């Protein structure tokens, strides 16, 4: 028997056997252990979940704003009470260090839910006067049943980022976690029910994106799809959503983000920021600043500071609280990252440190790749152009502000960007010219609940978090009222 046993679907407020009974394994990437068997949903299960959501959503939407707010706040309390339990599951499922999952993943997800729970009573329409005898008022009404499709790198956090605004606005959600990391989304479903969420308002269907994800995006009973993943999959989701019932979509599709260090920067601070922007969570963060631009005159000094810091990284068993760098999420992904590293070597980038998988001792059975830094990189290299989603930093030199802005924007992506400088005039001037949806000055990576998150260009459509996201889970109804007589031309 695996550590977490058989995991069922969550439909209509209860853990439910799938129709087919087919299963797939959840694997701990730190050691290859099968930690759970998960049931795979099929078309009948999708229909059941949609039917349950359609029943539960009107019940949820009919509650007062304060009633809905209290239920979501209770879910926040449960999440925080069970932080360590959920963090341990997340670590086993993703390979992320326990030091991360305990302090970030569940904590920040709960913060987002608390934020939207507090906004529910403030979700209101407008009154628009037309003339003395007439006015218009608007209502913000729920979309109905919406779908969320998650990525594997922040399973619980993404489930909360998607469900919190959807539920706050009075919708029901069917959530499909990544088949690679599904366990904590199933736990979240039980937590919502324990907090008082009506049956059917939050459902979880596990299975592959090609099957379950596609069925959700094409289902006529779904009003909106929020997707996090790669560009190719996102385009397919968007096309299916538009081709079925013209669904609304939110897309977060990754990036190849520039981090620009200017000559006046504190080089130690710049190196610390670059380390967090590349190696946190073993480099598996969509906003990572993997293209690090450094003035040519400072390149050698900066490289030295980076190498010193990489050597201090504590690589190990993610369940050991001393570990701050764990395995990649799967053996398949490890192989993908290694192919990119091999490409960097072939194309002539200079390997400063790393560049290999870790296959000895206690790490021998895990999906580990050493923190890797390339320098003397060119803009046309594969490691500079494509999202690797692993612990691979590319250092590029530049000589002028105009040059680095042009090169930073020379990408199909536009998710994030950052600058490190003591000159705030320059910081704002440059940031305003960078084509990215999330920008940082003298910091990197924090995404507060109040901060809209999303990309330009191929990095996405729409935003997550912030007030505007709550509004995008509603539709506006306009009502005109006439208080005097009505005159017909007929």
Swiss-Prot record:
<comment type="function">
    <text>Involved in the biosynthesis of the osmoprotectant glycine betaine. Catalyzes the irreversible oxidation of betaine aldehyde to the corresponding acid.</text>
</comment>
<dbReference type="InterPro" id="IPR016160">
    <property type="entry name" value="Ald_DH_CS_CYS"/>
</dbReference>
<dbReference type="InterPro" id="IPR011264">
    <property type="entry name" value="BADH"/>
</dbReference>
<feature type="active site" description="Nucleophile">
    <location>
        <position position="286"/>
    </location>
</feature>
<keyword id="KW-0558">Oxidation</keyword>
<dbReference type="InterPro" id="IPR016162">
    <property type="entry name" value="Ald_DH_N"/>
</dbReference>
<feature type="binding site">
    <location>
        <position position="460"/>
    </location>
    <ligand>
        <name>K(+) 2</name>
    </ligand>
</feature>
<keyword id="KW-0520">NAD</keyword>
<feature type="modified residue" description="Cysteine sulfenic acid (-SOH)">
    <location>
        <position position="286"/>
    </location>
</feature>
<feature type="active site" description="Proton acceptor">
    <location>
        <position position="252"/>
    </location>
</feature>
<dbReference type="GO" id="GO:0046872">
    <property type="term" value="F:metal ion binding"/>
</dbReference>
<keyword id="KW-0479">Metal-binding</keyword>
<feature type="binding site">
    <location>
        <position position="387"/>
    </location>
    <ligand>
        <name>NAD(+)</name>
    </ligand>
</feature>
<feature type="binding site">
    <location>
        <position position="457"/>
    </location>
    <ligand>
        <name>K(+) 2</name>
    </ligand>
</feature>
<feature type="binding site">
    <location>
        <begin position="150"/>
        <end position="152"/>
    </location>
    <ligand>
        <name>NAD(+)</name>
    </ligand>
</feature>
<comment type="pathway">
    <text>Amine and polyamine biosynthesis; betaine biosynthesis via choline pathway; betaine from betaine aldehyde: step 1/1.</text>
</comment>
<feature type="binding site">
    <location>
        <position position="93"/>
    </location>
    <ligand>
        <name>K(+) 1</name>
    </ligand>
</feature>
<comment type="subunit">
    <text>Dimer of dimers.</text>
</comment>
<comment type="similarity">
    <text>Belongs to the aldehyde dehydrogenase family.</text>
</comment>
<protein>
    <recommendedName>
        <fullName>Betaine aldehyde dehydrogenase</fullName>
        <ecNumber>1.2.1.8</ecNumber>
    </recommendedName>
</protein>
<keyword id="KW-0560">Oxidoreductase</keyword>
<dbReference type="Pfam" id="PF00171">
    <property type="entry name" value="Aldedh"/>
</dbReference>
<feature type="binding site">
    <location>
        <position position="180"/>
    </location>
    <ligand>
        <name>K(+) 1</name>
    </ligand>
</feature>
<feature type="active site" description="Charge relay system">
    <location>
        <position position="464"/>
    </location>
</feature>
<keyword id="KW-0630">Potassium</keyword>
<feature type="binding site">
    <location>
        <position position="254"/>
    </location>
    <ligand>
        <name>NAD(+)</name>
    </ligand>
</feature>
<dbReference type="InterPro" id="IPR016163">
    <property type="entry name" value="Ald_DH_C"/>
</dbReference>
<dbReference type="GO" id="GO:0008802">
    <property type="term" value="F:betaine-aldehyde dehydrogenase (NAD+) activity"/>
</dbReference>
<feature type="binding site">
    <location>
        <begin position="176"/>
        <end position="179"/>
    </location>
    <ligand>
        <name>NAD(+)</name>
    </ligand>
</feature>
<dbReference type="GO" id="GO:0019285">
    <property type="term" value="P:glycine betaine biosynthetic process from choline"/>
</dbReference>
<feature type="active site" description="Charge relay system">
    <location>
        <position position="162"/>
    </location>
</feature>
<feature type="binding site" description="covalent">
    <location>
        <position position="286"/>
    </location>
    <ligand>
        <name>NAD(+)</name>
    </ligand>
</feature>
<feature type="site" description="Seems to be a necessary countercharge to the potassium cations">
    <location>
        <position position="248"/>
    </location>
</feature>
<dbReference type="InterPro" id="IPR015590">
    <property type="entry name" value="Aldehyde_DH_dom"/>
</dbReference>
<feature type="binding site">
    <location>
        <begin position="230"/>
        <end position="233"/>
    </location>
    <ligand>
        <name>NAD(+)</name>
    </ligand>
</feature>
<dbReference type="InterPro" id="IPR029510">
    <property type="entry name" value="Ald_DH_CS_GLU"/>
</dbReference>
<feature type="binding site">
    <location>
        <position position="246"/>
    </location>
    <ligand>
        <name>K(+) 2</name>
    </ligand>
</feature>
<dbReference type="InterPro" id="IPR016161">
    <property type="entry name" value="Ald_DH/histidinol_DH"/>
</dbReference>
<keyword id="KW-0521">NADP</keyword>
